[in-house]
């Protein structure tokens, strides 16, 4: 019996290589927005519904992470309560404005909104309302997928059309693009794993820019390294907001 592991690795690495070749300037542009916000007293907010919330969590309160990141994580848009709940709710109007108000997002801030398809009401509305506030918007999405589907928002537009910067995760239409041999089954979704890579790359570039400009960014250490708790508690108390 043959294994699919090597073929899947090749499939995944093709997408990762494409992202490496095409997304550097978007990462740099996004990092400039975030670093400027930080130096001017702003914050970096991150939001994703469904599985995309994992990317928001990846850079929130994380070892090596910027303490000025705030993840917007409404439990009703995650998967731990009922799997289909977020699917239904992210198509409803009016939620995004409440989330932004609850987290006190301002015109000093940058928000990254993550949606693989970029078509559903909540992420599109989140981008519109963020822009209305005056915050800068970074979209993380799949351009291959988003450009192949219609919007579910009343504007007829998708997330990337309201963004100042677009990070393209390179995922194929439908996300799960690896075909199981001798079948019509597609699996191996990549949007979250590549998305986490892009999110970490954005943080790394942001920290690079801040240090270059003489700004000492507050960065967490791993809580599982001896002696880190006291350091992290100080950082947390001074900078973390939720």
From Swiss-Prot:
Residues 34-217 form the SIS domain. One of its GO terms (molecular function) is carbohydrate derivative binding. InterPro entries: RpiR-like_SIS, SIS_dom, SIS_dom_sf, SIS_GmhA/DiaA_subfam, UPF0309. GO terms for biological process: carbohydrate derivative metabolic process. Belongs to the UPF0309 family. HAMAP family: UPF0309. This is UPF0309 protein BH3325. It comes from Halalkalibacterium halodurans (strain ATCC BAA-125 / DSM 18197 / FERM 7344 / JCM 9153 / C-125).
């Amino acid at each position: 019996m043959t294994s699919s592991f090597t073929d899947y690795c090749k499939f995944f690495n093709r997408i990762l290589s494409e992202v490496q070749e095409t997304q550097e300037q978007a990462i740099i542009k996004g990092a400039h927005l975030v670093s400027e916000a930080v130096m001017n007293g702003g914050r970096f907010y991150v939001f994703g519904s469904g599985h995309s919330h994992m990317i928001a969590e990846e850079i929130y309160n994380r070892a090596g992470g910027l303490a000025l990141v705030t993840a917007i994580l409404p439990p009703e848009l995650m998967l731990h309560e009922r799997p289909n709940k977020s699917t239904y709710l992210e198509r409803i109007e009016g939620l995004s404005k409440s989330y932004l108000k609850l987290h006190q997002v301002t015109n000093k801030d940058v928000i990254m909104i993550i949606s693989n398809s970029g078509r559903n009401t909540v992420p599109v509305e989140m981008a519109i309302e963020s822009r209305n506030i005056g915050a800068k918007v970074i979209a993380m999405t799949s351009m291959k997928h988003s450009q192949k589907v219609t919007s579910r928002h009343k504007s007829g537009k998708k997330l990337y059309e309201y963004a100042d910067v677009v990070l393209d995760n390179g995922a194929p239409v439908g996300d799960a693009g690896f075909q199981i041999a001798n079948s019509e089954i597609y699996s191996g979704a990549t949007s979250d794993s590549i998305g986490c890579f892009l999110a970490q790359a954005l943080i790394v570039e942001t920290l690079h820019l801040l240090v270059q400009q003489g700004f000492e960014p507050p960065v967490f250490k791993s809580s599982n390294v001896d002696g880190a708790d006291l350091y992290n508690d100080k950082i947390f108390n001074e900078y973390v907001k939720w």
